[in-house]
Amino acid sequence: DDSMEEVVTVFIRTGSSLKA
């Protein structure tokens, strides 16, 4: 599902932002 991949991408971006 593309939706699932999109959610994962958002999660990764959010985590990176929080870490940064």
UniProtKB/Swiss-Prot annotation:
<keyword id="KW-0492">Microsome</keyword>
<comment type="subunit">
    <text>Dimer of 18 kDa and 60 kDa subunit.</text>
</comment>
<protein>
    <recommendedName>
        <fullName>Putative 18 kDa spermidine-binding protein</fullName>
    </recommendedName>
</protein>
<keyword id="KW-0472">Membrane</keyword>
<dbReference type="GO" id="GO:0005789">
    <property type="term" value="C:endoplasmic reticulum membrane"/>
</dbReference>
<comment type="function">
    <text>May have spermidine-binding activity.</text>
</comment>
<keyword id="KW-0256">Endoplasmic reticulum</keyword>
